[in-house]
């Protein structure tokens, strides 16, 4: 008979060595407004390939039909053509952007440079309905959300009523299913001596940002404007690290958006990195508190007196910034399976 102490040690060792379950992730993006969204989705797929996460859906807050097409092209490039895509209706930034047009680029034989079958946002369902469907099907307290665009979709989800997918309101559904919301938005530290930078993702839909900041029922971790600035993506990687394929969505999008030599801030990838790897020491966190969004889009953080606030923001030392930058680069340049 095995001694109880030895059995206990073996069981503890087995539990310690067991791989962590993949993070169930929903990614909400304004794909097309900046190339860091492409970096973030690239990272997600490479982490999914490693078993670190499971991408349940991508929802889009940029209201242009090519945004969904390019998201599907990226998903397909990485070997995940069936990831559900939902789109905003009557949302912000209806202009095409600089690189979503890559979804329409053709090879000499007439085939798509980046194959995909969602040809337009008109072919995709509305985001809130898709979000409710996906969340309702997941176990309780199992889903992480990464929002790297505007607040429109998630604010509308908050207000959504019961439907065929769930008898719960949007707020109650989120409270039941979601563990954390990791947001790239706002500014919480001084950047180039500017203390009140009005961050893009907030100012494009201020009422939605205000609603979410007040009424969101789960913990929120904010990756502020200052974080991505401090861990900019090195342009040398774009120039050298994607030679394993003639066309890569990230490299092509980077050149279309603002070609090297320039180092692009990694705003959106930092929110994704935290959502999937919150315990790897890439970032520190502020004390618990609350974030207020003013009418002009300014964000203010106040620590809670009782230490029970639901909002925190990312803090990153110079040493952590170097780690974050290298992690993002390696997670972006990794070749998809079979390439």
Give short role names for the model-derived ranges.
Residues 20-339:
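N-terminal acidic, glycine/proline-rich low-complexity segments
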């Amino acid at each position: 008979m095995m001694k109880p102490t030895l059995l206990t040690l073996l069981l503890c060792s087995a539990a310690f060595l067991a791989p962590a379950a993949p993070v169930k992730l929903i990614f909400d993006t304004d794909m097309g407004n900046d190339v860091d969204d492409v970096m973030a989705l690239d990272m997600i797929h490479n982490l999914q390939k490693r078993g670190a996460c499971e991408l349940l859906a991508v929802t889009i807050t940029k209201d242009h039909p090519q945004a969904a097409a390019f998201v599907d092209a990226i998903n397909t490039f990485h070997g995940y053509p069936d990831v559900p895509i939902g789109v905003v209706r009557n949302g912000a930034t209806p202009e095409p952007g600089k690189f979503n047009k890559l979804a329409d680029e053709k090879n000499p034989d007439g085939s798509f440079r980046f194959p995909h079958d969602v040809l337009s946002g008109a072919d995709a369902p509305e985001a809130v309905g898709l979000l409710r469907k996906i969340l309702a099907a997941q176990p309780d307290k199992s889903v992480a959300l990464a929002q790297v665009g505007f607040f429109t979709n998630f604010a509308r989800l908050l207000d959504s009523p019961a439907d065929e997918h769930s008898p719960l309101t949007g707020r109650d559904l989120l409270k039941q299913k979601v563990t954390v919301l990791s947001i790239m938005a706002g500014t919480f530290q001084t950047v180039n001596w500017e203390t009140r930078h009005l961050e893009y993702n907030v100012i494009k839909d201020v009422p939605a940002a205000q609603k979410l900041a007040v009424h969101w029922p789960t913990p929120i971790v904010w990756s502020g404007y200052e974080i991505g600035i401090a861990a900019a993506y090195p342009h040398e990687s774009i120039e050298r690290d994607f030679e394993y394929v003639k066309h890569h969505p990230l490299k092509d999008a980077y050149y279309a958006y603002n070609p090297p030599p320039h180092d692009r801030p990694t705003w959106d990838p930092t929110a994704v990195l935290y959502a999937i790897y919150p315990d790897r020491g890439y970032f520190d966190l502020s004390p618990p508190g609350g974030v207020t969004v003013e009418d002009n889009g300014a964000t203010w953080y106040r620590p809670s007196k009782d230490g029970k606030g639901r909002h925190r923001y990312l803090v990153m030392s110079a040493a952590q910034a170097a780690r974050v930058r290298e992690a993002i680069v390696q997670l972006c340049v990794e070749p998809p399976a079979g390439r």
